[in-house]
């Protein structure tokens, strides 16, 4: 096998940690001696052994004098686990092949430097693009402290996400819907607008056996979330954050004495708002107060607050209005577009991105690094957002 083939195997191993390692990266490691793989490992779950230590732990024979292939630069700092460079040095590894440099300020070349100082030869940038793509979420979050946002929608070939009557089940087939469940497992959180909740009463959970439910984030400026919705009824089992305008809190907390009948009505409304907040919190909902912009949740302020909660990635399953707001705010990093070979027609049928839109093709949101995958009868186009 070639160096690239060994690294390809390490990438395959790393992907087994998908959905379980956040906010840590996915990492795989392969140990080779005399042309034979003698040990393999990956970072299986956040807080547990890193890939290098797992690979050493599972060696079939002594790793003394062996080579190691690892998708990400070995760490050199103490966290929930001790530095991996120490384990590599102690094991007597003679050469390390690295896929990606680690942009974490606590590492940032330090791991490679220490290995070299101990006489270990280091080869970098082996399948770098593939290894970088493996951890696009981690790289973005560690450098910005904001969630990596992937917009997802399913539409017909004429660009409709529902019929003119509002029906949308199902646009795509079973394989495409299974792929969506994998995304829900992969991303730390899932975000939708209150319009989607009111229209569909969704659960927004991962339905893969053994999968991880994403944290649910509902953008709900004026707190219209029904107390009897599935979101509320399952909030004690599935972590749920409802993003509400700070103005809503200010109104709810108003204690001005009523001077007129109008004031009395307003005071009663504020009492009802306070009561609803209390009942939602009693049901396990976290209310997150966010700045308001143009009558809606300020998505950049929301991203800042979610990043502070170590939410490193979000799958955006919004309607047309929220999707446009997200693009206009510049928070979207990636787009997953599932396209079904169907035509709905209808001038009033909803589209995946609504709002005002752009005034000129020259001002379009540009996408790049596109990849097309066939899923049953449907197609998935994945693209990175190049500019907003």
List the model feature ranges, each with a label.
Residues 8, 12-15, 39, 50-53, ...:
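A broad detector of short, well-ordered amphipathic alpha-helices
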Residues 18-21, 46-51, 75-79, 142-145, ...:
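Short acidic/polar alpha-helix capping motifs at helix-coil junctions
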Residues 21-34:
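N-terminal glycine-rich anion-binding loops that anchor highly charged ligand groups
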């Amino acid at each position: 096998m070639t160096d690239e083939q060994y690294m390809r195997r390490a990438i395959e191993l790393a992907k087994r940690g998908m959905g379980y390692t956040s906010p840590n990266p996915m990492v795989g490691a392969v140990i080779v001696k005399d042309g034979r793989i003698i040990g393999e490992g990956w970072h299986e779950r956040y807080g547990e052994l890193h890939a290098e230590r797992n690979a050493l732990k599972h060696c079939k024979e002594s790793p003394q004098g062996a080579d190691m292939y690892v998708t990400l630069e070995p760490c050199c700092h103490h966290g929930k686990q001790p530095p991996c460079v120490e384990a590599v040095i102690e094991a007597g590894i003679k050469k390390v092949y690295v896929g990606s440099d680690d942009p974490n300020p606590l590492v940032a070349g330090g791991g490679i430097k220490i290995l070299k100082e101990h006489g270990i030869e280091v080869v970098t940038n082996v399948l770098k693009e593939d290894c970088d793509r493996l951890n696009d979420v981690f790289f973005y979050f560690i450098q910005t402290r904001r969630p990596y946002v992937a917009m997802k929608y399913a539409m017909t070939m004429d660009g409709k996400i529902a019929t003119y009557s509002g029906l949308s089940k199902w646009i795509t087939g079973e394989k495409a819907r299974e792929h969506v469940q994998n995304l829900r497992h992969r991303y730390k959180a899932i975000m939708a607008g209150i319009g989607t909740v009111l229209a569909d009463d969704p659960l927004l959970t991962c339905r893969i056996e053994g999968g991880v439910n994403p944290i649910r984030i509902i953008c709900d400026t004026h707190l219209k979330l029904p107390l009897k919705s599935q979101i509320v009824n399952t909030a004690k089992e599935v972590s749920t954050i409802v993003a509400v305008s700070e103005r809503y809190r200010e109104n709810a907390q108003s204690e001005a004495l009523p001077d007129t009948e109008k004031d009395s009505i307003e005071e009663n409304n504020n009492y009802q708002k306070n009561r609803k907040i209390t009942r939602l919190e009693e049901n396990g909902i976290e209310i997150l107060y966010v700045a308001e912009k143009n009558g809606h949740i300020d998505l950049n302020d929301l991203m800042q607050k979610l990043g502070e909660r170590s939410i490193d990635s979000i799958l955006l399953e919004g309607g047309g209005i929220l999707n446009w707001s997200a693009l206009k705010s510049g928070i979207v990093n990636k787009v997953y577009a599932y396209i079904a070979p169907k035509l709905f027609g209808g001038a009033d049928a909803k589209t995946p991105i609504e709002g005002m839109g752009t005034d000129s093709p020259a001002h379009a949101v540009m996408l790049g690094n596109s990849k097309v995958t066939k899923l049953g009868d449907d197609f998935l186009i994945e693209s990175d957002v190049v500019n907003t």
